[in-house]
C-alpha cells in the first residue's frame, strides 16, 4: 500500500528529513521566532533555492554543500526568516542524491515548499486547537501598571540595546519588550512598597 502511495522505492519521497526538525520547532516551541510561518516557509524556500543553485554551479559536492549552507544562513538572516532546519534543506539539495538532483529547481516547490506549507498549516491547526497561540503574538499584560508605577524604555532604545548586544537571541523583540516592561513594573512596586525579595 505504501508503495502505491509513495511510488517505487527509487522515487522521491513526499517528505524530506529536515521537516522532522521543523516539526519539533513548530509543535514543541511555537512561540520561538525560529518557528514562525515566515521563518519556516521563507527559510526553507530560500535554502532550497540556494542549495539547488550551488549544486548546479559548483562541481565539488563538499564545496557546494558548504557554500549552500553558509549562503542560506546569510540570506535568511537578511530576510529575517532564520529557521535552523533550513540549513539541512540546503544540504539536502546538494547531497540528496540523483532523484533530488533530477528535480532541479522543482525541488524548491515540491517537496520543500509543499512540505513547509502543510507543516505550517498543521501547526496552526494543532496549536490553536490546544490553546497555544500560533503564529505567536506578544503577550499583553492583563493588568498594566498604573502610569505612576511605569518606567519606560522607548522602542528606539530597545532597538539600540539589541543592536549593541550583537547576537541573535531566540525571543521576539515584542516579547522581550513585554517581559522588560513587566520586570520594570515589578521592580517599581518593590521600590514603592519597600519590599525586597
Residue ranges and their predicted role:
Residues 60, 71, 75:
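Anion-binding (especially nucleotide phosphate/pyrophosphate-binding) glycine-rich loop
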Residues 90-107:
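Transmembrane helix-loop junctions at the membrane interface of multipass transporters and ion channels
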Residues 30-39, 76-87:
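Membrane-helix interface "capping/anchor" motifs
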Residues 169-176:
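Short, surface-exposed acidic
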Residues 1-50, 59-66, 104-109, 113, ...:
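Alpha-helical transmembrane segments and their membrane-interface boundaries
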Residues 56-67, 82-89:
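Subset of alpha-helical transmembrane segments and adjacent helix-loop junctions
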Residues 24-26, 51-55, 76, 90-95:
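Generic transmembrane alpha-helix signature in multi-pass membrane proteins
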Residues 85, 176-197:
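Hydrophobic alpha-helical transmembrane segments and immediately flanking/interface helices
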